[in-house]
């Protein structure tokens, strides 16, 4: 996508140094645009854990490139196979909720172990990492193709008046290599000339909505307004939201959706106000084994200081500011689970389906057990 008129993806191999993978340091956005080079597994894990990169599809792609870097750096390993398995385990456990990470690492490991020597391992790792990255880009593009008609239909029903879409957190190209999941239908509709406006939840505590979604929508020229996390229900009650589109970090094959904490409350408000609530996702985000999302999806708890402090630009410097009493504790639950019954539909690379086991099976019979 465009950044000040130049095309970028959220992760890419350095064109001059094949042993370096480059990412955008999303912690600094929107006030600083900085590119960071990853050269080791340790740096890759740090980038995932400390949220230089975030968003399920991008975490998966980053994990894939991390495995590639593990193979590149295994030249001095006494037992290459043991080394590979240990590094893959470390990468898989960098963050617990997004299923894409574990899926991508397993796919990388399987592709590598089909080969018999380290030199071929490097070639296989490079090819598979490229394949995984390009697949995510293609899938997100298709999500836009299948999701934009929903926006077009609302526009027709409103006689061309503005379609107001609410989204939570950042499920844009910054989270997905390119295009995004929740934003893919929005970009596709906007590029067709449909009058759209996006309500952007600020998404505390790290403000991925106000920092990232607002920034990338602005770069694309999409009209948007940042709102507090608790304003969505009020807007729905007064007819100012036509639809909700969010992303997901893990969705069970039965349709339960884990996404940034606060998503569940948006779904409840949408249900109460008859506002369609859609979840956009590539199939790499579907957990094909898990059935009960509320009970079984692992939910990450992050540093309480992310809740206690706010981050921003002050006098040209990026600073953290303590808000509550210093002695007050905080709980930082990073995700929640929206039950399938609250989801109007899933938007995937193969089309739309109900948020149910039968619905998912209708699009992905080859992946269901």
UniProtKB/Swiss-Prot annotation:
Active site, per annotation: 249
GO molecular function: S-methyl-5-thioribose-1-phosphate isomerase activity
Keywords: Amino-acid biosynthesis, Isomerase, Methionine biosynthesis
UniProt EC number: 5.3.1.23
Alphabetized Pfam families for the sequence: IF-2B
Reactions performed catalytically: 5-(methylsulfanyl)-alpha-D-ribose 1-phosphate = 5-(methylsulfanyl)-D-ribulose 1-phosphate
Site residues by UniProt (Transition state stabilizer): 169
Keyword Cell membrane: no
Listed GO biological process terms: L-methionine salvage from methylthioadenosine
Pathway it works in: Amino-acid biosynthesis; L-methionine biosynthesis via salvage pathway; L-methionine from S-methyl-5-thio-alpha-D-ribose 1-phosphate: step 1/6
UniProt-listed Gene3D superfamilies: translation initiation factor eif-2b, domain 1, Translation initiation factor eif-2b, domain 2
Enzyme class: isomerase
PANTHER family documented for this protein: METHYLTHIORIBOSE-1-PHOSPHATE ISOMERASE (PTHR43475:SF1)
NCBIfam families xrefs: eIF-2B_rel, PRK05720.1, salvage_mtnA
Known role: Catalyzes the interconversion of methylthioribose-1-phosphate (MTR-1-P) into methylthioribulose-1-phosphate (MTRu-1-P).
Protein name in UniProt: Methylthioribose-1-phosphate isomerase
Naturally occurring in which organism (per UniProt): Desulfatibacillum aliphaticivorans
């Amino acid at each position: 996508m465009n950044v000040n008129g130049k095309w970028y993806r959220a992760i890419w191999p350095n064109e001059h140094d094949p042993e370096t993978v480059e990412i955008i340091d999303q912690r600094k956005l929107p006030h600083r645009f900085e590119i960071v080079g990853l050269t080791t597994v340790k740096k890759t894990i740090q980038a995932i854990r400390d949220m230089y990169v975030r968003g399920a599809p991008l975490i998966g792609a980053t994990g894939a490139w991390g495995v590639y870097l593990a193979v590149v750096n295994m030249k001095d390993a006494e037992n290459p196979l043991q080394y590979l398995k240990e590094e893959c385990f470390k990468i898989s456990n960098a963050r617990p909720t997004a299923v894409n990470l574990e899926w991508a690492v397993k796919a990388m490991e399987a592709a590598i172990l089909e080969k018999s020597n380290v030199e071929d391992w490097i070639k296989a790792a490079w090819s598979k990492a490229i394949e995984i990255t390009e697949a995510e880009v293609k899938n997100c593009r298709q999500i836009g193709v299948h999701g934009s008609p929903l926006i077009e239909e609302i526009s027709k029903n409103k006689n061309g008046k503005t379609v107001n879409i609410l989204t939570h957190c950042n499920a844009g190209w910054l989270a997905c290599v390119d295009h995004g999941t929740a934003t893919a239908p929005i970009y596709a509709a906007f590029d067709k000339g449909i009058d759209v406006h996006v309500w952007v939840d600020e998404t505390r505590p790290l403000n991925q909505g106000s920092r990232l979604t607002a920034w990338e929508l602005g770069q694309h020229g999409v009209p948007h307004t940042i709102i507090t996390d608790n304003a969505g229900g009020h807007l729905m009650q007064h007819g100012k939201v036509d639809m909700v589109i969010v992303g997901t970090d893990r969705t069970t094959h039965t349709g339960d959706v884990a996404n940034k904490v606060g998503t569940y409350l948006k779904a409840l408000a949408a249900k109460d106000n008859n506002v369609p609530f859609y979840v956009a996702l590539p199939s790499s985000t579907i957990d094909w084994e898990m059935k009960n999302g509320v009970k079984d999806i692992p939910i990450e708890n992050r540093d309480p200081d992310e809740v206690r402090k706010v981050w921003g630009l002050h006098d040209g410097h990026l600073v953290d500011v303590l808000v509550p009493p210093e002695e007050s504790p905080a709980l930082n639950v990073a995700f929640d689970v929206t039950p399938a019954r609250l989801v109007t539909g899933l938007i995937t690379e193969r089309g739309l389906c109900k948020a149910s086991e039968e619905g998912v099976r209708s699009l992905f019979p080859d992946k269901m057990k």
